[in-house]
Amino acid sequence: MSARIGVITFPGTLDDVDAVRAVRLAGAEAVNLWHADADLKQVDAVIVPGGFSYGDYLRAGAIARFAPVMGEVVRAAEQGMPVLGICNGFQVLCEAGLLPGALTRNEGLHFICRDQWLTVESVSTAWTSRYEPGAQILIPLKSGEGRYQAAPAVLDELEGEGRVVFRYSGDNPNGSQRGIAGISSANGRVVGLMPHPEHATEALTGPSDDGLGLFLSVLDTLVTA
């Protein structure tokens, strides 16, 4: 039986369909999860996709964090379930306390939409084992509030524990502290990143297929769990 990976849809989510397709391309069963669901339908992992959940009112991810399904995601993550937050999903995971820090308005206050080179800094997470350390991958970036910020002590802790998972290569597109594009939880099971790997799973339709590695990695994690 193939792994079951849930993909959450909030009001305002845009990239759930692409995440579902990425899951299927990797060879897993995609399970649609609605924001009001009170259970996770026996999934093995969860993806919180990008978009503008609840219109980004208050601040990005602030309302989605209180959706019924997120209560279940937090409980499951605390028990070791792999969770991936992409763009708005990363913001939601930070708001939910599963990842430290916050995502704020881009430096320069412009929405950014471009293909972005990333450096894979950690391959020790549930979502990055298929990559080589230091690999350069090309992934679309599209966000207005993608500037990662945290207290200096938190940044030092992330660096010291190897929890910076992705870093922007070359110029820093949004002013994120230390060029951070993605981080993980202490156990490596929860990962959040601003760029969109689900838009880079097929060379025909994306800038590359470099993003597929995240979805393949979690399948490896689930098989060996």
From Swiss-Prot:
Pathway linked to the protein: Purine metabolism; IMP biosynthesis via de novo pathway; 5-amino-1-(5-phospho-D-ribosyl)imidazole from N(2)-formyl-N(1)-(5-phospho-D-ribosyl)glycinamide: step 1/2
GO molecular function, one term: phosphoribosylformylglycinamidine synthase activity
Presence of keyword ATP-binding: yes
Short name of any one Pfam family annotated for the protein: GATase_5
Residues covered by the Glutamine amidotransferase type-1 domain: 4-225
PROSITE patterns the record matches: GATASE_TYPE_1
Keyword Phosphoprotein appears in the UniProt entry: no
Reaction catalysis annotation: N(2)-formyl-N(1)-(5-phospho-beta-D-ribosyl)glycinamide + L-glutamine + ATP + H2O = 2-formamido-N(1)-(5-O-phospho-beta-D-ribosyl)acetamidine + L-glutamate + ADP + phosphate + H(+); L-glutamine + H2O = L-glutamate + NH4(+)
Cellular compartment(s): Cytoplasm
Main location: cytoplasm
Entry EC number(s): 6.3.5.3, 3.5.1.2
BP-aspect Gene Ontology terms: 'de novo' IMP biosynthetic process
Record key words, sorted: ATP-binding, Cytoplasm, Glutamine amidotransferase, Hydrolase, Ligase, Nucleotide-binding, Purine biosynthesis
Catalytic residues (positions): C87 (nucleophile), H196, E198
Gene3D superfamilies reported for this sequence: 3.40.50.880
Quaternary context: Part of the FGAM synthase complex composed of 1 PurL, 1 PurQ and 2 PurS subunits.
Role of this protein: Part of the phosphoribosylformylglycinamidine synthase complex involved in the purines biosynthetic pathway. Catalyzes the ATP-dependent conversion of formylglycinamide ribonucleotide (FGAR) and glutamine to yield formylglycinamidine ribonucleotide (FGAM) and glutamate. The FGAM synthase complex is composed of three subunits. PurQ produces an ammonia molecule by converting glutamine to glutamate. PurL transfers the ammonia molecule to FGAR to form FGAM in an ATP-dependent manner.
HAMAP family hit by this protein: PurQ
Protein name per UniProt: Phosphoribosylformylglycinamidine synthase subunit PurQ
Organism: Nocardia farcinica (strain IFM 10152)
Annotated gene: purQ
